[in-house]
Amino acid sequence: MSEPFKSGFVAIVGRPNVGKSTLLNHIIGQKIAIMSDKAQTTRNKVQGVYTTDESQIIFIDTPGIHKPKHKLGDFMVKIALNTFQEVDLIYFVIDASTGFGRGDEFIIEKLKNVQTPVFLLINKIDLIAPEDLFKLIEQYRDLMEFDEIIPISALQGNNVPNLLEQTNANLEIGPMYYPKDQITDHPERFIISELIREQVLQLTREEVPHSVAVVIEGIEKNPKTEKLTINATIIVERSTQKGIIIGKQGQMLKQIGMRARKEIERLLGSKVFLEVWVKVQKNWRDKEHYLQDYGFDREEY
């Protein structure tokens, strides 16, 4: 007799840049959470769905937890903390190469207040010596009792199969929430805007990134050629930022558009014509109605 089907929700939490999105993308096998080396890259809960014949795991990739500096920051931390209560299991990801960080203490204090089981995932183990890894494990073990401590490399996939095995062991019998071939519950529009924002983050200087939102104004399919026309607007807070994103003779914007278009074509499997504009909206991160316009819905969280 076959084993009953299991399912559950797993939150991936940790300081900014510890590799949460890389891990999610490695497990799902397709790029659904935006990745960049800049802090606070992930803004909304991106759900990745991993389905096998035995189980379905729904992953929630939360923003990096940090001390908020503005309303958008408040919003991002609130999402992450609320998530702890809603899920069946929490992955707390740390970066082995940087060791214990100030933000980890903040997260551990929050984790101590929830009943949800917590796995400590020590990521980037390929970057440190084995003896340093053992010291790190002991250090975190003294701070909190974790249900499992699993060293991994999200980028290379080291020990990820073992992680998924341990995760399955912690799941309850449950339904298949999503169709077998579905890997995320976010609409295509959201993922397209995230892919454009990823290129802005990767290509522009430090002052621009966190002041950027991307709004998809329209997506149209040409019935004859099957080609998609996507109109997108990059929203920034200052005209100097607009200048940086457009670049000399429009070169930076051209680069952003070209790289984003390739990623979008890979995602959708069809040819894309991408038109990108840049618009200044002063202090949008502190204005609630703008936050809602750009996809940050307070009610949803």
Curated annotation (Swiss-Prot):
Domain of life where this protein originates: Bacteria
Primary location class: cytoplasm
Entry keywords, A to Z: Cell membrane, Cytoplasm, GTP-binding, Membrane, Nucleotide-binding, Ribosome biogenesis, RNA-binding, rRNA-binding
Domain KH type-2 residues, every copy: 204-282
GO molecular function: GTP binding; GTPase activity; ribosomal small subunit binding; small ribosomal subunit rRNA binding
Residue ranges crossing the lipid bilayer per the database entry: none
Residue numbers spanned by region G4: 123-126
One family name in Pfam for this protein: KH_2
Chain spans, region G5: 152-154
Residue ranges of the region described as G3: 61-64
HAMAP family, sorted: GTPase_Era
Family assignment from sequence similarity: Belongs to the TRAFAC class TrmE-Era-EngA-EngB-Septin-like GTPase superfamily. Era GTPase family.
Listed name of the protein: GTPase Era
Organism: Listeria monocytogenes serotype 4a (strain HCC23)
